[in-house]
Amino acid sequence: MGGEILNAAILSFGLIFVGWGLGALLLKIQGGEE
């Protein structure tokens, strides 16, 4: 049970981190073009 909760927490954190990284990268690309 504990392992499942930990796995879900890591997955959620990973998705948030990836989404934040992609957003920051897109802002950098748009800022560089303009």
Curated annotation (Swiss-Prot):
Membrane topology summary: Single-pass membrane protein
One GO term (biological process): photosynthesis
Keywords: Electron transport, Membrane, Photosynthesis, Thylakoid, Transmembrane, Transmembrane helix, Transport
One Gene Ontology cellular component annotation held by this UniProt entry: cytochrome b6f complex
Sample GO molecular function, one term: electron transfer activity
Pfam families on file: PetM
Transmembrane segments: 9-27
Primary location group: membrane
Localization, UniProt: Cellular thylakoid membrane
Listed InterPro entries: PetM_cyt_b6/f_cplx_su7 (IPR012595)
Domain of life of the organism encoding this protein: Bacteria
Family note: Belongs to the PetM family.
Biological role: Component of the cytochrome b6-f complex, which mediates electron transfer between photosystem II (PSII) and photosystem I (PSI), cyclic electron flow around PSI, and state transitions.
Description of how the protein assembles with itself and partners: The 4 large subunits of the cytochrome b6-f complex are cytochrome b6, subunit IV (17 kDa polypeptide, PetD), cytochrome f and the Rieske protein, while the 4 small subunits are PetG, PetL, PetM and PetN. The complex functions as a dimer.
Protein name according to UniProt: Cytochrome b6-f complex subunit 7
Organism of provenance: Nostoc punctiforme (strain ATCC 29133 / PCC 73102)
Recorded name of the encoding gene: petM
